[in-house]
Design a protein with these regions (language model features):
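Active-site mouth loops of central-metabolism enzymes
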Residues: 3-15, 63-70, 156-167, 221-222, ...
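Hydrophobic faces of well-ordered beta-strands that scaffold small-molecule active sites
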Residues: 3-7, 32-34, 58-61, 88-92, ...
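Active-site-adjacent beta->alpha loops and helix N-cap segments on the catalytic face
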Residues: 40-47, 188-203, 327-331
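Acidic (Asp/Glu)-rich catalytic clusters
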Residues: 46-57, 77-87, 176, 207-210, ...
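An alpha-helical appendage that flanks or caps ligand/catalytic pockets
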Residues: 109-153, 193-311, 345-356
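Short, acidic/polar
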Residues: 12-24, 76, 166-174, 234, ...
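N-terminal beta1-alpha1-beta2 module of alpha/beta enzyme domains
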Residues: 1-60, 66, 160, 350-355
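A structural motif
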Residues: 29, 85, 179-180, 314
Length: 356
């Protein structure tokens, strides 16, 4: 099992953020993901850390499809793949109407079709082919004008891995069909089939197996002999996910928890959050949900969670280590890595792994 982290910037402390990645690379972390919502973009920070690292893979986790043309996504991917000497991973997601329409002023429509066509055009461009495409959302060149089918002036970069952050059944099937990896959220190993069944259906449609995808999920990591102390601070974040990451009509994260059997909780927390009762919303998040979506407690308890992810079929554990300082975060990360390696040693001598 591989380990991934996220590049997170507190305020404007870019030096601290980049040093975290440099040290994580030294410890053996496999990849780092840079995200975007309505703050910093996902791309620029990766260029910053690419110049300071040599081995760790660098991924956009995620670029919001629809905020950039497919050609610009391809140009960005080829630039980062070139400057990082092949370490770049292109992570894409559709975001949601509140961000796409509210922040970018772009209509949130046909998200699955838009994503599929974006990937088609990106792969066409990165292979060095002329951009000629006729889809339901995109058509290149644009008809009725003076545009020509262009070939990228950059050197071809075929085979850039594409990861999709998807949650709905239809988008999960598309991920299994056309992507190289999946960036999961709202995930609990005990309910992995809520996602994996759809990923597998898409993979089968493309004549391949789920084992050909890198499945990346995980959560917050914190060590303590008093696990009860670690639970309450995680509840506001889950309440935010259930209540604020979308509208009442469109919240893909909330829908995922409902499909996993937490419909009553998801609806109640969402209702309270949208009514402005955020503390009440957080208080309704059950301890069980916190423990299932994170890796908390003693080393033995965290190891059990690692094993649960492994048995479910997860190939890369994406984690956020606890710590108020750089040193504290790295200490947590180092303990986690040691447990992952110890777990992998046990697998090597015969411990079972779930079929994917």
């Amino acid at each position: 099992m591989r380990v991934a982290i996220s590049l997170r910037v507190e305020g404007r402390d870019w030096e601290d953020a980049s040093q975290y990645v440099v040290e994580a690379e030294r410890l053996g972390v496999d990849c780092v993901w840079s995200h975007e919502s309505w703050g910093y973009d996902a791309v620029t920070p990766l260029a910053f850390v690419a110049a300071r690292t040599s081995r760790i893979q660098l991924g956009t986790g995620i670029i919001q499809a629809g905020t950039r043309t497919p050609a610009l996504v391809a140009m960005t991917a080829m630039s980062l793949a070139s400057m990082s000497r092949g370490r770049f991973l292109l992570g894409l997601g559709v975001s949601g109407p509140q961000v796409i329409e509210g922040w970018h002023g772009i209509r949130f429509d046909r998200p699955v079709t838009r994503m599929r066509e974006t990937i088609d055009i990106v792969r066409q461009a990165t292979r060095g082919e002329r951009a000629s495409y006729k889809g339901r959302v995109y058509e290149l060149p644009l008809p009725g004008g003076e545009g020509k089918a262009l070939r990228s002036a950059a050197a071809p970069q075929p085979g850039i891995p594409i990861y999709l952050a998807t949650l709905s059944p239809k988008s999960l099937e598309m991920t299994g069909e056309i992507a190289d990896g999946w960036l999961g959220t709202s995930f609990m190993p005990e309910h992995a089939r809520v996602f994996f069944d759809h990923l597998e259906a898409g993979a089968k449609r493309a004549g391949r197996s789920l084992a050909q995808l890198d499945l990346q999920v995980g959560g917050f990591v914190a060590f303590s002999d008093d696990v009860d102390r670690l639970i309450p601070p995680r509840k506001p974040g889950l309440a935010f996910t259930l209540g604020a990451m979308g509208s009442r009509q469109h919240n893909f994260y909330n829908d995922a928890f409902k499909r996993a059997g937490y419909e009553d909780v998801a609806l109640e927390v969402q209702r309270l959050w949208l009514d402005g009762r955020r503390d009440d919303a957080a208080s309704r998040v059950p301890d069980e949900l916190v423990l299932k979506t994170n890796l908390l407690g003693t080393e033995a308890m965290v190891r059990q969670r690692i094993e649960a992810y492994r048995r479910a079929g997860v190939t890369t554990l994406r984690v956020e280590p606890a710590g108020e300082s750089l040193g504290a975060r790295l200490a947590t990360l180092e303990r986690l890595l040691a447990l992952v390696r110890d777990t992998e040693k046990s697998v090597a001598v015969g411990a079972p792994r779930a079929a994917r």
